[in-house]
Regions:
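Conserved nucleotide-sugar donor-interacting segment of glycosyltransferase catalytic cores
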Residues: 92-163
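A donor-sugar binding/catalytic signature common to diverse glycosyltransferases
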Residues: 18, 44, 282-326
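C-terminal amphipathic helix plus adjacent low-complexity
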Residues: 353-403
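Short amphipathic alpha-helix
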Residues: 20-31
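Conserved nucleotide-sugar phosphate-binding/catalytic loop shared by glycosyltransferases and other
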Residues: 3-9, 14, 30-82, 86-88, ...
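A nucleotide-sugar donor-handling region in carbohydrate enzymes
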Residues: 139-228, 253-258
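Donor-nucleotide binding loops and adjacent catalytic segments primarily
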Residues: 28, 184, 199-292, 326, ...
């Protein structure tokens, strides 16, 4: 029997990669069991989109962010200014039509400040809605970028917006691994309830028959900045194949620029033991079929590594102020969960050596909470039931923390 599901409006903007998209879709899959979800997608939609019941996908005029940290339009029909104006109106119109019970915004105001022009009007509208009185929540990953030149000012601004417009922060991490205050240090204490959900992992996909693990799997999330890793991997494979006959599969990712993809295709043509794939709908089954993993260290890649238990060498992506992956990699290495190769040392020869050494690495049991998607649903339900309380009394103190 069908039962009434309250409306939930989820906003997600991915820019450089697709990590935010993947995590938000994993959350959506869990949330759709209890809510009718409208997903406002602000970036380019990936080719592979798993079907989710009770999901309405609304693709906004897509925007990305370049290496200069400036917005650019991913639809030639719109300039950046035109896209921003259209997006703002679409978002407000969608809210007015849906009158959602829950508004869930990914990352903002801890990031995406260039999109404040479309998000602050939404937040103000939700706060003025005295009839629906929606629960307004922020969805955050485990580690924030904290190397900005104006970091103190940025953190204080984020704190002020959060305390003014949000009912709660959902941090998708195990607090034993990372806490928000490690990378977020406003001048004044945050008053908004902060709740740790555990990590949002896709959940293991049981296989009827598990073949023996064999070979190296190389990946870089969406692939947008994966070309240097893939080039080094091809060189490493050529070095190791002559003596070890260790097969390699490279999954380039849907966002690897087409020119880089064609370059890879040309390079691997005729190479024995090397398989090149553009993208796959799910990485975890492929990880579980391989004996070793070489990858960057994005949130979702790490979730797949931890769930699969595959011995992993991570080469964290670092660019300018973005040190999130390096921080995550260091924490994982300290727990004995991965091995690290510093990106400054990435060469074909060095990677070939580290791949062979990785065969002797046995990762420790993760011991981390990876059930964050289901826990997020429970937390939202409890927050709705106790919206007038500062901190829901039903929450376990292990997962509730006020900065």
């Amino acid at each position: 029997m069908n039962h009434y599901k309250p409306r939930l409006l989820l906003y997600c903007q991915h820019s450089l990669g697709m990590g935010h998209w993947v995590r938000a879709m994993t959350l959506t899959n869990a949330l759709s069991r209890e809510f009718r979800v409208t997903f406002l997608n602000g970036g380019r939609a990936p080719d592979h989109q798993a079907a989710v019941a009770d999901l309405d996908m609304l693709n906004l005029p897509p925007l990305g962010m370049g290496e200069d940290h400036q917005l650019y339009s991913q639809d030639e029909r719109y300039s950046v200014e035109e896209a921003l104006a259209a997006r703002k109106q679409i978002i407000l119109d969608e809210y007015a039509m849906l009158r959602p019970k829950v508004v869930l915004i990914e990352l903002f105001p801890f990031g995406r400040k260039k999109l404040a022009g479309e998000l602050l009007p939404l937040l103000k509208t939700a706060r003025r809605d005295k009839q629906t009185k929606p629960l307004v929540l922020c969805s955050l990953r485990d580690i924030m970028v904290n190397a900005r030149k104006d970091q103190s000012r940025h953190d204080e601004r984020a704190r002020w917006i959060t305390d003014r417009y949000f009912d709660g922060l959902l941090v998708h991490a195990d607090p034993r691994f990372a806490r928000l205050e490690d990378s977020f240090k406003p001048r004044h204490p945050l008053q908004t309830p902060l709740l740790y959900t555990g990590f949002v992992a896709p959940g293991r996909i049981p296989a009827a028959i598990k073949p023996p693990r064999h070979g190296v799997l190389v990946s870089a999330g969406g692939g947008m900045v994966g070309a240097p890793l893939f080039q080094a991997a091809i060189q490493a494979h050529a070095i190791n194949w002559t003596t070890e006959k260790l097969p390699m599969t490279i999954v380039a990712g849907p966002f690897l620029p087409e020119a880089d993809w064609q370059d890879l295709v040309a390079q691997v043509k005729g190479m024995a033991g090397l398989t090149l794939r553009r993208s796959v709908p799910a990485m975890q089954p492929l990880l579980e079929a391989h004996s070793l993993s070489v990858s960057q260290c994005g949130y979702n890649t790490v979730m797949d590594i931890l769930e699969s238990g595959t011995p992993a060498l991570v080469v964290p992506f670092v660019r300018g102020q973005e040190d999130e992956q390096s921080q995550r990699a260091q924490k994982l290495a300290e727990l004995g969960l991965v091995e690290i190769l510093n990106p400054s040392e990435l060469t074909g020869q060095r990677l070939a050596e580290r791949i062979l050494q990785l065969r002797d690495f046995s990762p420790n049991p993760a011991g981390l909470n990876l059930a964050g998607a289901d826990h997020t649903v429970r937390l939202i339900q409890e927050l709705r039931a106790s919206k007038n309380d500062l901190i829901p009394g039903a929450q376990s103190t292990e997962y509730v923390h006020v900065c």
